[in-house]
Amino acid sequence: TLSPTWGIYSGYELCENTPLREGSEEYLDSEKYQLKPRDWATAAREGTTIAPLVTRLNTIRRAHPALHRLRNLRFHHTDNDALIAYSKREGSDVVLVVVNLDPHRTQEATISLDMPQLGLDRHESVPVHDELTGRTYQWGRTNYVRLEPGRAPAHVFHVRRPSAAAPQNGGAGVS
């Protein structure tokens, strides 16, 4: 969601990441070096594929005009360098993303939003709907986040305008 265009190498969906050699950024199983048959069905059955997540992210990207542009990217402060927070806004469509950059450990942080960048008043509170989980939270200028790799590595929030529906979970929530 950071960039409007992206792609992945075949096999990445199966989390293949063995380097070609020590310290190399190139992958051993890259189609650059070989053709490798992959067992997609077994990976799906065993839960060792991120293909459903990639599919969901692509669906979210198609649904939100804010994610179709590059120059509308704005970063928001986190008090933990292992988490990144950014937003994209196009007209009334506002998407806020928080990602755990640590693939091994759960990370927590307070996210401080630049409310005017979201088209909101500094002290406003709005419902944010997580497009990955379906949950809705009430967020204001500062918000607590806890993200676990393998379970909830990110939030992709659709920021609901003040006239939008109230949160489904009854108010502020810990993510």
Protein language model features and the residues they cover:
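Carbohydrate-interacting/catalytic domains
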Residues: 2-3, 8, 12-175
